[in-house]
From Swiss-Prot:
Keywords: Nucleus, Transcription, Transcription regulation
InterPro entries: TF_A-like/BEX (IPR021156)
Name of the protein described by the UniProt record: Transcription elongation factor A protein-like 1
The encoding gene: TCEAL1
UniProt feature, compositional bias: Basic and acidic residues: 17-34, 64-80, 95-119
Organism the protein comes from: Gorilla gorilla gorilla
GO cellular component, one term: nucleoplasm
Length: 159
């Protein structure tokens, strides 16, 4: 019990230091020569990036340094500088904007792709029947996935 008190009493006495005991203040990096700065930067890089990782990170660091700063560009200027998009983003294309069900669109597109169906003489009815089968398979698959999802999460504890 006496030891912790003595240690606590010694600490306040050693806390205030005079100007003579303080280490000399280092000069700001602005006043140092470029050679001193580069050696300090190298040592700090070595601390943060071990030599094994340095070759992997080097190309990324070089690429980031070569980029010209884009100062003073407003959002408007950035958008004007970009070329217009050739195709709309996914989900906004023609196939989503066309009216009609999947089967109707498939039947309409058949004449466009006649050359792609090599030697197949499919009538519109056959194509619609195949589309019905595909839709049925999708529905069954989705039902099974939902049932599986519910079964996994209905337990009081994870499996």
């Amino acid at each position: 019990m006496d030891k912790p008190r003595k240690e606590n009493e010694e600490e306040p006495q050693s806390a205030p230091k005079t100007d003579e005991e303080r280490p000399p203040v280092e000069h700001s990096p602005e006043k140092q020569s470029p050679e001193e700065q580069s050696s300090e930067e190298q040592s700090s890089e070595e601390e943060f990036f071990p030599e094994e990782l340095l070759p992997e990170l080097l190309p990324e660091m070089l690429l980031s340094e070569e980029r010209p700063p884009q100062e003073g560009l407003s959002r408007k200027d950035l958008f004007e500088g970009r070329p217009p998009m050739e195709q709309p983003p996914c989900g906004v294309g023609k196939h989503k904007l066309e009216e009609g069900s999947f089967k109707e669109r498939l039947a309409r597109s058949r004449p466009q792709f006649k050359g792609d169906i090599h030697g197949r003489n499919l009538s519109n009815e056959e194509m619609i029947q195949a589309a019905d089968e595909l839709e049925e398979m999708k529905r069954v698959r989705n039902k099974l996935m939902i049932m599986h999802w519910k079964a996994k999460r209905s337990r009081p504890y994870p499996i």
